[in-house]
Regions:
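Bacterial Sec-exported substrate-binding components of ABC uptake systems
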Residues: 2-61, 162-194, 255, 309-320
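Short helix-initiation/N-cap motifs at beta->coil->alpha
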Residues: 41-43, 94-105, 228-240
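Short secondary-structure boundary segments
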Residues: 59, 119-120, 250, 254-258
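A short, structured surface patch at a secondary-structure boundary
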Residues: 59-110, 114-119, 222
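His/Asp/Glu-enriched short active-site or ligand-binding loop at hydrolase and phosphoryl-transfer sites
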Residues: 84, 211-232
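Proline-aspartate-enriched helix->loop->beta-strand connector
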Residues: 96, 104-117, 135, 239-253
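Extracytoplasmic ligand-binding site segments that recognize negatively charged/polar headgroups
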Residues: 122-126, 138-154, 188-213, 259-261
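Structured C-terminal subdomain patch of bacterial secreted/periplasmic proteins
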Residues: 157, 166, 253-320
Length: 320
């Protein structure tokens, strides 16, 4: 059934819903201030170099934000979901497997002085071996817009290029303000954000990354009123009964991959079930598939662009 969530989907949601929250606990003045103590998203206190020289990043967001803050990488996850300039910059950087399946042996052999990872089970499993090898690893989560800015600022401190990080932040905030200003004086639309795989569909809450952006733009996320049974990682199972009652004015659809099969399945659902046909969004042709590069994974430095895309879709009454 369409409203079932599998264990595999939950892991994917953890990957999408989010990747990197930095929380600084304190700093140690040790060895001429070469070490700092931070608390990662898993609540672990980790002693890391103040300015690491050999960094391995295990997800797209870490790669994007660290490089954009002036850093260079010794190793990285194999991923194509990067901004063009970052993708070019890391083209020759050795890969250490995929985000959900990092090659631990390769990572240890590189002898990095810092590993940037996501707060997900796949990366939690790396901790014992890396700690034993004396390699610090930060498990990070990013669930909203503000956490992107915080992480950029943190990475600027690590790379010693705080000005470059500040410039990136200023650019993002400018795009953010433009997107928000475009909503001024316009009625707040009722919005449904869907996350889809070939197996099932879920509704995104405001605690999800895309849900946070919708809320910042003044959209009313109807999913926040849904039954929270089965909720995990900012998503709840899709309920067609709920959709029929909520009658969203805009439906935004995110696929977990660039595979057209998910989109085809969703279109078939829209055409074949009265719950969809009765919604304002479907009747007014305001159902939009969100760009994979900006919404299927955390957009990192492209979050300002993601805001601009959302603003246009939420507040345009034109049929798409």
């Amino acid at each position: 059934m369409i409203n079932r969530i599998s264990g595999a989907v939950i892991v994917i949601l953890l990957l999408v819903g989010g990747f990197m929250l930095y929380s600084q606990d304190s700093r140690e003045t040790m060895k001429n201030e070469t070490v700092r103590l931070v608390t990662d998203s898993a609540g672990r206190q980790v002693s890391i170099p103040a300015h690491p020289k050999k960094v391995v990043a295990l997800n797209a967001s870490s790669i994007d934000l660290y490089v954009s803050a002036g850093g260079s990488l010794a190793g990285r996850a194999a991923t194509e979901t990067l901004p063009p300039d970052v993708k070019a910059a890391v083209q020759q950087v050795p890969t250490v497997g995929l985000t959900p399946n990092p090659d631990l042996e390769k990572i240890v052999a590189m002898k990095p002085d810092l590993v940037l990872a996501a707060n997900i089970p796949y990366h939690h499993a790396l901790v014992p071996v890396l700690e034993k090898a004396g390699i610090p690893i930060l498990l990070q989560t990013m669930d909203n817009y503000q956490q992107i800015l915080d992480t950029l600022r943190f990475y600027g401190e690590l790379t010693g290029q705080t000005d470059k990080a500040a410039s990136q932040i200023a650019q993002i905030e400018k795009q953010y303000q433009t997107a928000v200003q475009n909503t001024a004086g316009k009625p707040a639309p009722k919005v449904l954000v869907l996350w889809g795989t070939t197996e099932s569909f879920s509704m995104a809450l405001s605690s999800s990354f895309t849900g946070d952006l919708v809320k910042r733009l003044g959209g009313i996320n109807v999913s926040d009123q849904a039954d929270k049974n089965g909720a995990m990682a900012g998503y709840v199972p899709l309920s067609l009964e709920f959709v029929a009652k909520a009658s969203p004015e805009v439906i935004l659809f995110i696929t977990h991959s660039s595979d057209d099969k998910v989109e085809e399945k969703f279109k078939n659902e829209l055409a074949g079930h009265p719950a969809w046909q009765g919604s304002l969004a479907v009747r007014q042709n305001r159902v939009h598939k969100l760009p994979y590069q900006l919404f299927a994974v955390n957009p990192g430095t492209q979050v300002g662009k993601a805001m601009e895309v959302l603003s246009g879709l939420l507040y345009s009454s034109e049929a798409k």
